[in-house]
């Protein structure tokens, strides 16, 4: 499933006889999307974030307030392109808009559950932990494709709400059904960091995983068929 196919699947059924097309939002921090063909669509919403200082990797309270103002007029129910992995913490800001209990499925080579280096800062390495600590509507987090070494650093107290799975565990529909019935609660928000892919499939700013593009596409197709997905974001552009 390439970007265009993902956009084509960016629809949700409100009722059996009515389909709502999600907005596609591009958050422009580095200018990278200007060089990508898929983004040349005049129906996409471009949010210019290039003027915002103090947002790369780490974001303080003032930066968070500014970013919340930028996205205030747009729903979590959409497809959000959020630039490089340095801005993956934006998933927290988008999902804070959801008003129903949900599960978060993250495709990422990193668990993003480190304690922040600076108190009160939201970061690309701590945002999943922050979601679990502060968003009571986030019932479960599933992280797919994370490094085994990094998984071992996740504090044990999060074990009841966080699960880790490899592509091999889930890459068929029966496996997904069994997994979903045991671990997914409610609708699903999908967050994809392209560093889950191997270097032959994508170039990112971070160390990368072992998924091929085809493997990721196949698993995403299963999730989109089997779950009620209420929002999607994608990061991992090479800045």
Describe the residue ranges of each PLM region.
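Conserved alpha-helical scaffold segments that buttress catalytic/binding sites
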Residues: 2-239
């Amino acid at each position: 499933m390439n970007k265009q196919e993902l956009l084509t699947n960016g629809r949700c059924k409100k009722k059996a006889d009515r389909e709502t097309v999600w907005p596609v939002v591009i958050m422009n921090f580095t200018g990278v999307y200007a060089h990508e063909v898929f983004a040349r669509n005049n129906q996409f919403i471009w949010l210019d974030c290039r003027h915002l200082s103090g947002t790369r990797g780490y974001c303080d309270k003032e930066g968070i307030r500014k970013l919340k103002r930028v996205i205030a007029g747009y729903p979590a129910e959409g497809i959000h392109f959020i630039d490089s992995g340095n801005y993956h913490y934006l998933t927290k800001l988008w999902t804070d808009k959801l008003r129903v209990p949900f599960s978060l499925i993250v495709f990422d080579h990193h668990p993003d559950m480190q304690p922040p280096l600076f108190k009160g800062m939201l970061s690309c390495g701590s945002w999943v932990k922050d979601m679990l600590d502060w968003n009571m509507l986030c019932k479960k987090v599933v992280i797919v494709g994370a490094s085994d070494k990094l998984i071992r650093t996740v504090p044990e107290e999060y074990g009841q709400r966080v699960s880790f799975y490899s592509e091999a565990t889930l890459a068929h529909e029966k496996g997904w059904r069994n997994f979903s019935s045991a671990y997914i609660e409610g609708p699903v928000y999908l967050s994809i960091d392209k560093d889950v892919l191997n270097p032959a499939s994508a170039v990112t700013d971070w160390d990368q995983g072992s998924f091929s593009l085809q493997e990721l596409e196949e698993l995403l197709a299963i999730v989109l068929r089997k779950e009620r997905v209420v929002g999607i974001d994608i990061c991992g552009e090479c800045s």
